[in-house]
From Swiss-Prot:
Stated name of the protein: Protein translocase subunit SecA
Family: Belongs to the SecA family.
EC number: 7.4.2.8
InterPro entries tied to this protein: Helicase_ATP-bd, Helicase_C-like, P-loop_NTPase, SEC_C_motif, SecA, SecA_CS, SecA_DEAD, SecA_motor_DEAD
Catalytic activity: ATP + H2O + cellular proteinSide 1 = ADP + phosphate + cellular proteinSide 2
A cellular component annotation (GO) from this entry: plasma membrane
Binding site for ATP: 87, 105-109, 516
Amino acid sequence: MLKAVLETTIGSKSKRDLKDYLPTLRNINKLERWALLLADEDFSKETEKLKDELKSGNSLENILERAFTLSREAARRRLKERPYDVQIIAGLALHKGKIIEMKTGEGKTLSSVQAAYLNSLTGDGVIIVTVNDYLAERDSNWMKPVFDLLGVSVGVVLSNMDYELRKAQYAKDITYVTNNELGFDYLRDNMRYDLNEKSLRKFNYCIIDEIDSILIDEARTPLIISGPTEGNTNAYLEVNSLVSFLKECSKDPKTGDYPLEIDDLDGDYTVDEKAKRISFTAKGLNNLEQLLVSKGIISGSMYTDSNFNYVHYMTQALKAHLLFLKNREYIVGDSGVEIVDEFTGRVLTGRRYSDGLHQAIEAKEGVRVANENKTMATITFQNLFRMFDKISGMTGTADTEAKEFHKIYNLDVVVVPTNRLLARIDEDDTIYYTEEFKFNAITDEVYKTYKKGQPVLVGTVSIEKSEILSAMFKNRGIKHEVLNAKNHSREAFIIAEAGAKHAVTIATNMAGRGTDIKLGGNIEHRVRKKIGTNVSLEEFQEAVKNERENYLKDYNEVKSLGGLYVIGSERHESRRIDNQLRGRSGRQGDPGRSRFYVSLEDDLMRLFAGDNLRSLMGKLGMATGEPITHSLLTKSLINAQKRVEDRNFEIRKHLLEYDDVITKQRDFIYAQRNSILEDTAIKDRILVALEEYLSFLLEGTKSSTVSNVFLNEVNSIFAYMLESLGSIENISSLDLKAKLMQIAKANLDEKENLIGRDLFNGFLRYEYLKNIDFKFQEHLANLDSLREAVYLRSYANKNPITEYKEEGFSIFSELIKDIKVSTIRRVLQLKLDSNSSDFKSTKKSRNVKPIHKELSGIVINENKSASNVQVVRSSPKIGRNEPCYCGSGKKYKNCHGKS
């Protein structure tokens, strides 16, 4: 209430920001006459002047008005488009580190030019992030003539580029790149074994296009670089055949809920559709064990080390059958099971679900089951973009998520007014009792509109629903196009003609499509279709000019019919995604219309709407197929979406709390790697680490005594070198430490003299980095296990995140110690042959291919190159099952054989 009163009296934060930009806008408009008088060759000279001013201590704010004026005039000259005042305001907001909400067709791409140009003048680089390669390449090519005139370089990073080309592109003043490629390049850079192989420079300023898609929709999507691991792929085939033998617990037919008392659960497992979780009952675990034994899959107890993984395999198999459906979450294509993006409807080529879920789906679908992967490096988009000194973003829909943007990223949303008033009519939702009634009504409405000639865009949430509607349209004789993950190769053509007269298009989610639907069709696409692509730019422009009269005739005819009619076949979980679909109509002041059709069988209503709605709607007569609008129903629909949005926000916030623990540890590890990469005296670093560790072992002991723990650890580190130590009777701990340091130094000096200082430093660097990477990979797996463990502690009234932070810190402290000790042990015990002269500072270029994590992560396979160092053993190889040489009593494979 107070917020509403304040906004009425002093305006919202967004409106106050807009008002603050007006004086600057007026000054930019006044300077326009100055820019009009400049010759083309003067623009790069003016750019150099602005750069010199910054080097002399001037600020970006003091040169802002001139920079914006120059870039506006450059756009007018090269693109024949003069940015409107609202686009200049949007550019100002982007420079200030805000998120701008601009409606579809209002020119977000051009609005980013001014902010990108201004911030590029510092020389620290600007990154413009897009959601796919097509948009990155399109936008960079589109804006390149503007930046060329201004004298600033522009580059683009695409998924098929090698690291050398990437490095060159990132070195440009302004670089276009997708969020995925940027994240992977950051992870890859921090797995390099040579500083010169790094492609990125310091994160300075970035502009994120479709920022809501990247920082909200994909916030739960960890980027993962992984390597192959030995997995029991046959197990997924074995348990897949057992799914039908297990039974879901019964639900209350009235509420649709399971009994609250555990003893009342009568089945083997429960299903949580909202959280996509399967939980076994005690009875279910007993039945699973009996099944596994009776089918000869295991022998003995299911709870032994060798058998307990079958609980995980079975859980994933049930998920695959009950929660992940073909043509909804994935399709089966030529390359096997392919994930479909929930928000865009596109196939996520090469990505795989993690934790064995993808293998379970492959077993379900009868395709080849691939090996699992282990995580080598990971980061979320939340923490990737928080590393930039300044970030801003743009989208057509951000205001509904303003609270989350502010709380998580400290970013404010500025709603930029349209250049022309919005003429689209947004109709009230039409609500039906069943999905069948709803689809019949949509078909009737589309048929009527199609006969009139008005173009229609029908949005669906899955491939399955798009194919149902397509079949119904075909039966009614409605000529139409279908845009979904199965035919995404025709996307450009389908979207180009979606605004033409009589066009009917069924699209599976329009979020992130990045292409405007123009009334009357797309003139450029129409011309390309007529004259082909092998023509000069001048010929193409002439053909466009000749076609314009016909195009304007079609445009005006479609406009008179009411513009594009958008029909939503159901409500999405997020109001923002619904708004994105609506926003395809009514661009730049064009007329348009939108309406959503909803049924009680839609996932949103079924999972999140109130329990009494179905009986109420039956009483209102809807069971007969009649639609209804009612304030209670509308309110329930809005509340259902808000509940989902709030729940998803809490999930993302919770994820960030866990991820912050990993982030701090990853930052420390990567800082250590960088320090080692730059270090020209790693031998000294290793000796310092050894002295610190020996001192740690001696803490609390008397100087005259040496503990057995100390001796055992010394034995494990120095091994055969202790022969030169002689008797240690009657030697103090401090004297022993000094002698050990002498032995270590002599050992390393001898190796350094053998192959040379630079070569030896490279060898030590390689061993240190290899150890860090290997141990950190194990640590990430341990953190995953810890997270699963602390989740269960909530049942004991313990705070899982507190437990995770405390234990995570403890195992990280052990990791740091283990890295140092295992590196010291290895470099001391290895002998370098005098023929090792071919060893060079080891480079580890990685050939990676993007793969996906369960809720949506991306996994990359890593191919490790072998080192050229020749290693000669000083003693016979120890068998994996023999006692470890350190005296711990463990088998070698479970002790020092791990490293």
